Amino acid sequence: MKSYYFESNEPVSVQQLNNINVLYYPMPMPDYQEKLDQICQERGYKNRDEVKLNENTENLDAKLKIFFEEHLHDDEEIRFILEGSGFFDVRDANDQWIRIRVEKGDLIIVPANMYHRFTLTETKQIHACRLFTDAPKWVPINRHQQ
């Protein structure tokens, strides 16, 4: 994981992310299951699914356009990266973008009600495990709708 201010490229530490309630867990690969199960138990994540995006994904550009629209959710957004890489952009307390590059072995938790967006890296490939407290769902509330 690497994070930095989008405009200035100034590095952002894990502690700075924690200060805005974005949580990061480095996961041991390939033996991640025990740690993942522990995090799920501690945080009440009862459901999970997997999503794969790559150049062969039907309507990839349309999906990425939706993901890159600035939005928030009523629930946390939890992603554990199994393969590939992507960028989460989150807003800090001063409404500045922080870019977070996630890749294989990274688990990130974006808190509920935090504006963010997502896109793939230049490789255009990611395989992620999505974790949920209830039934799997992804309902964005776009910023322009507020």
Swiss-Prot record:
Gene Ontology CC entries for this record: cytoplasm; nucleus
UniProt cofactor(s): Fe(2+); Ni(2+)
A GO MF term: nickel cation binding
Presence of keyword Phosphoprotein: no
Subcellular location field: Cytoplasm; Nucleus
Note accompanying the cofactor annotation: Binds either 1 Fe or Ni cation per monomer. Iron-binding promotes an acireductone dioxygenase reaction producing 2-keto-4-methylthiobutyrate, while nickel-binding promotes an acireductone dioxygenase reaction producing 3-(methylsulfanyl)propanoate.
SUPFAM superfamilies per the UniProt record, alphabetical: RmlC-like cupins
Enzyme class: oxidoreductase
Keyword Heme: no
Reaction equation(s) it catalyzes: 1,2-dihydroxy-5-(methylsulfanyl)pent-1-en-3-one + O2 = 4-methylsulfanyl-2-oxobutanoate + formate + 2 H(+); 1,2-dihydroxy-5-(methylsulfanyl)pent-1-en-3-one + O2 = 3-(methylsulfanyl)propanoate + CO + formate + 2 H(+)
EC number: 1.13.11.54, 1.13.11.53
Pathway info: Amino-acid biosynthesis; L-methionine biosynthesis via salvage pathway; L-methionine from S-methyl-5-thio-alpha-D-ribose 1-phosphate: step 5/6
Binding site for Fe(2+): 71, 73, 77, 116
InterPro entries: ARD, ARD_euk, RmlC-like_jellyroll, RmlC_Cupin_sf
GO terms for biological process, alphabetical: L-methionine salvage from methylthioadenosine
Keywords: Amino-acid biosynthesis, Cytoplasm, Dioxygenase, Iron, Metal-binding, Methionine biosynthesis, Nickel, Nucleus, Oxidoreductase
Binding site for Ni(2+): 71, 73, 77, 116
Function (record text): Catalyzes 2 different reactions between oxygen and the acireductone 1,2-dihydroxy-3-keto-5-methylthiopentene (DHK-MTPene) depending upon the metal bound in the active site. Fe-containing acireductone dioxygenase (Fe-ARD) produces formate and 2-keto-4-methylthiobutyrate (KMTB), the alpha-ketoacid precursor of methionine in the methionine recycle pathway. Ni-containing acireductone dioxygenase (Ni-ARD) produces methylthiopropionate, carbon monoxide and formate, and does not lie on the methionine recycle pathway.
Family: Belongs to the acireductone dioxygenase (ARD) family.
Name the record gives this protein: Acireductone dioxygenase
Organism: Heterostelium pallidum (strain ATCC 26659 / Pp 5 / PN500) (Cellular slime mold)
